[in-house]
C-alpha cells in the first residue's frame, strides 16, 4: 500500500514500484489524501481550470484514474472519500492556514479515515514520504503523519472496533533519494534537482524499475494538467532517463530482509516476510 498526497505523486515517486508489483500479481493499493485542487495548471488548453480549485480537483481525479490504469491493477482509496481533505498549497502560501486544508485537518478525523483503510486492505508493506515530506510540502508531511499516527490505533483492538479487525503493519518504508543519485544526474547535465537526500548507506531498499519505466512515463503523461514531458525542462529531461525508474526507500518499521551489494540493499520490499 502506498500513501500519497496528491494525484501524480504516486506516479512520480513510486510509479515503477507500483507497476512492478502489480505485474507480479501482488495486491497493490493506493491512498490519495487530497485531489490536488491547488496544483499549477501547465497545459494552456486547460486554462479554464486555473483559479478554479473545485474544477481542477475533479479533473485531477479523472487523471489519476487514467494513470492507475497505465500502472496496472491498483486498488484506489481517497482518504475519507473524494474531496474530504483539500490541498494545502505549497509551503509558505496563505492557503497553508485554511481551515479546510489537509495540513490543518483534525488528527482524529485523519486517523480514523486511515485506520479504516489499513484494516480493510491489511497491507504487509506501506510506503509514504519521510517526515520532511520529501521537499517540505505541507501535504506530504501531513500524509506521513496520517500514516504514522494511524499505525498504532490500526493494531489496537480497543480502537473503534466498528472499523474492522485490527491490523499491525509488518513493514513501513519512507521514500527517499541517495546522494549518489543526485550526483549522477548532475553529472549527466540535469540541473536544478535539489531534493532532500540521505547518505547511500542509510538506504534500505532499492527497486530497479527500469523494466517498468515505460509504464511510469505513460502514467505521468495522463497528468496533462500538471506535467509536460515534451518541453525540455529539467523535470522532463529527468523523468525520461531510465534511472528515474530506480526507486529508493528507507525502512522505518519492521525487520530488514536480506540484501546485496556494498550497502546490503534489499531489492524487494517484501524481503524477510513470510
From Swiss-Prot:
Binds 1 zinc ion per subunit. GO terms for molecular function: N-acetylglucosaminylinositol deacetylase activity; zinc ion binding. GO terms for biological process: mycothiol biosynthetic process. The keyword RNA-binding does not apply. Its cofactor is Zn(2+). Disulfide bonds: none annotated. Keywords: Hydrolase, Metal-binding, Zinc. Zn(2+) binds at residues 6, 9, 140. Gene3D superfamilies: LmbE-like. Its EC number is 3.5.1.103. It catalyses: 1D-myo-inositol 2-acetamido-2-deoxy-alpha-D-glucopyranoside + H2O = 1D-myo-inositol 2-amino-2-deoxy-alpha-D-glucopyranoside + acetate. Pfam families: PIG-L. Belongs to the MshB deacetylase family. NCBIfam families: mycothiol_MshB. Catalyzes the deacetylation of 1D-myo-inositol 2-acetamido-2-deoxy-alpha-D-glucopyranoside (GlcNAc-Ins) in the mycothiol biosynthesis pathway. This is 1D-myo-inositol 2-acetamido-2-deoxy-alpha-D-glucopyranoside deacetylase 2.
